[in-house]
A protein has these predicted regions:
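Helix-to-loop junction immediately C-terminal to a conserved catalytic motif
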Residues: 60
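Conserved ABC transporter NBD signature motif
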Residues: 68-83
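Hydrophobic anchor residue at the start of the ABC signature
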Residues: 151
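Q-loop/switch helix immediately C-terminal to the Walker
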Residues: 93, 99-112
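The feature captures the beta-strand-to-loop junction immediately N-terminal to the Walker
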Residues: 45-47
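Conserved ABC ATPase "signature" region
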Residues: 107, 118-133
Length: 158
């Protein structure tokens, strides 16, 4: 049995078992079971109010589950690891100072948090494909470009 568990988590990035999340008496998630494999792409779809955002917040550790367990790479959320401290999350519409360039937005953040050098910021922007646009104001970025800037921010904070 132990051998099976080890091999299961080698190929599993997220394992959700019997997860229920209640707000008061109302269950938003009820007995959710889900296994997400490494190297696969998944989407969460459903009607408004069906619990998609709540599920994502539980996986990230931003909301505790009422019952059940969520493991990310074998580590249980809320017990084995403090994921909000160690996880980079990119929201659907990242908020940046639109009058400044992508470089300037990341430099401001780096200065506030005493993080990385300006040269490293430029390397990260190149890695996410924003080097040709690094001097363009973020207000002129497409949504996809803003999301890539959000990815650059998450990389920078890692």
């Amino acid at each position: 049995m132990e051998k099976w568990k080890k091999s299961e988590f080698q190929n599993t990035c997220v394992k959700i078992e019997h997860v229920t999340k209640r707000f008061g008496e109302d269950p938003v998630l009820k007995e959710v079971n889900l296994t997400l494999k490494v190297g696969q792409v998944y989407g969460v779809v459903g009607n408004n109010g069906s619990g998609k955002t709540v599920l994502m917040k539980c996986i990230c550790g931003f909301l505790p589950v009422t019952t059940g367990t969520i493991r990310v790479f074998g580590k249980e959320i809320g017990r084995d690891v403090d994921f909000p401290e160690s996880l980079g999350v990119i929201i659907e519409t990242p908020g940046f100072l639109t009058q400044y360039t992508g470089v300037k937005n990341l430099e401001i953040l780096a200065d506030m948090k005493r993080m990385i050098s300006k040269a490293d910021i430029r390397l990260i922007l190149k890695k996410v494909g924003l080097d040709p646009d690094m001097k363009k104001p973020v207000g002129k970025y497409s949504l996809g470009m803003r999301q890539r800037l959000g990815i650059a921010q998450a990389i920078m904070e890692d």
